[in-house]
Amino acid sequence: MNKRRANGSSHSTRPVRTGSPKWVRFSREEVEMLIEELAKKGYTPSMIGIVLRDQYGIPLAKPIIGKKVNQFLKDKGLASQIPEDLFNLIRRAVNVRRHLNEYPGDKTAKKGLEEIESKIRRLSRYYKRVEKLPQDWTYDPAKAELLVSASS
């Protein structure tokens, strides 16, 4: 019954491989340097992976550097305080709230905002449980708008 709000299932299947492909020309140090440069430019971990794949021909960073991009950024102190998926939901909620200020009669957008904020609360509860967020962290729309505008 809850199909409307379900996440999509369309995706490609990753090939099963333990090491890095033979045709990748970059060494471990070069890939680490690329990831650091992209992170300092403000790219998110998923965008770093897309840039590495599309512009440099590196299908996955993990077999080359031995860690996931997010873990590498955390070790270097370049990871963000709020997990990327939660931050993207917060950004969506801020955009929908901005839309509702302009068009207050949009009932569909109101329902969408309720669903997004519900998802934010569920995800934040999970991140508190696994200690990726501080226990006193709460979602506040006013603070969320400041957070999103500061990161832009």
Swiss-Prot record:
SMART domains: Ribosomal_S13_N (SM01386), Ribosomal_S15 (SM01387). GO terms for molecular function: small ribosomal subunit rRNA binding; structural constituent of ribosome. Signal peptide: none annotated. It comes from the Archaea. Residues 1-20 are annotated as: Disordered. Pfam families: Ribosomal_S13_N, Ribosomal_S15. GO terms for biological process: translation. One of its GO terms (cellular component) is cytosolic small ribosomal subunit. SUPFAM superfamilies: S15/NS1 RNA-binding domain. The keyword Ribonucleoprotein applies. Keywords: Ribonucleoprotein, Ribosomal protein. The keyword Ribosomal protein applies. PANTHER family: RIBOSOMAL PROTEIN S15P/S13E, SMALL RIBOSOMAL SUBUNIT PROTEIN US15. Belongs to the universal ribosomal protein uS15 family. HAMAP family: Ribosomal_uS15_A. Part of the 30S ribosomal subunit. This is Small ribosomal subunit protein uS15. The lineage of its organism: Archaea, Thermoproteota, Thermoprotei, Sulfolobales, Sulfolobaceae. The gene is rps15.
